[in-house]
């Protein structure tokens, strides 16, 4: 955790249209006129990792799901990394569920360890589907233990508060579901579940930013200057650039704080009351 995290990028642009994302397919087309994503070749991506490895013994985050282009892209990349003898710890990103075959391939490639970043954003399938993430809770629940069984050393899972069609109860349930997810893995498995506000700003260029009323949002900032002024506020709640039909800024803040003891209690049980 004390080492710097370096990054390599699989792609410029994206094939996915997550409503809240300023790097979505919609945002890239609308803001930078990119009609389709431009993928770095698997061989060049592996070369990027080799260059970092030659200078630093530090974790390397591969930005973008390796399978976004195709399964063949991921296989070519992993083979190239094996041929180059990648030794650094590697962090992969998931945009949907994954299975044993993929994780086994990752595990035999990165012998010195690998971990996962996965952002479902909500446990609520309705909320997630509206955002543009159509995979099921079952896919998430199967992915996590499978990853650990195949050698994953750490799994970071991210939920947010303040999403379209997400009311207070739905937001709280994302914390409650942590108990089920932690119960699905062994005590020694490092599953970290984060639950935080969609903050501080709605991504400029995202579908929500460009059409806020369509998504049930009221924005408090549109221009750069308006966003700068929000940063002068005394608390993070007042920095938020939005409210939704389902949750006010007060709701987002209250829910965020109410989840803390719930998540603390569950994580303490998961870790056998060891210090977090």
What residues fall within each predicted segment?
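Conserved, mostly hydrophobic/aromatic
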Residues: 14, 18, 45, 62, ...
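Catalytic cores of alpha/beta
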Residues: 165-181
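Conserved SAM/AdoMet-binding glycine-rich loop
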Residues: 42-154, 184
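Short acidic (Asp/Glu) and glycine-rich catalytic loops that position anionic groups and cofactors
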Residues: 25-29, 54-59, 152-158, 174, ...
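Active-site proximal loops enriched in glycine and acidic residues that flank catalytic Cys/His/Asp
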Residues: 10-12, 22-25, 32, 49, ...
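Radical SAM enzyme core and accessory elements
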Residues: 226-276
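Canonical Radical SAM [4Fe-4S] cluster-binding loop centered on the CxxxCxxC motif
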Residues: 2-41
């Amino acid at each position: 955790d004390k080492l710097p995290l370096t990054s390599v990028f699989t792609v410029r642009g994206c094939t996915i249209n997550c409503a809240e994302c300023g790097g979505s397919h919609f945002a890239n087309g609308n803001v930078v006129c990119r009609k389709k994503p431009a993928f770095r070749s698997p061989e060049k991506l592996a070369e990027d990792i080799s260059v970092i490895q030659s200078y630093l013994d530090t974790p390397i985050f591969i930005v973008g799901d390796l399978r976004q282009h195709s399964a063949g892209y991921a296989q070519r990349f992993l083979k190239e990394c094996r041929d180059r003898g990648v030794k650094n710890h590697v962090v992969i990103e998931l945009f949907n569920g994954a299975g044993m075959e993929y994780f086994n391939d990752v595990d035999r490639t990165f012998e010195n360890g690998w971990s996962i970043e996965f952002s479902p954003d909500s446990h609520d399938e309705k909320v997630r589907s509206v955002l543009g993430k159509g995979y099921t809770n079952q896919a998430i629940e199967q992915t996590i233990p499978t990853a650990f069984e195949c050698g994953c050393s750490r799994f970071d899972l991210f939920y947010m508060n303040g999403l379209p069609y997400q009311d207070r109860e739905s937001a709280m349930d994302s914390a409650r579901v942590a108990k089920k997810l932690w119960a699905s893995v062994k005590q020694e498995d490092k599953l970290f579940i984060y639950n935080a506000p969609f903050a501080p700003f709605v991504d400029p260029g995202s579908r929500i930013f460009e059409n806020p009323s369509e998504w049930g949002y009221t924005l408090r900032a549109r221009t750069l200057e308006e966003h700068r002024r929000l940063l002068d506020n005394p608390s993070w709640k007042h920095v938020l650039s939005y409210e939704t039909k389902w949750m006010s800024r007060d709701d987002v803040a209250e829910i965020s704080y109410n989840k803390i003891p719930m998540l603390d209690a569950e994580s303490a049980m998961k870790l056998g009351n060891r210090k977090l």
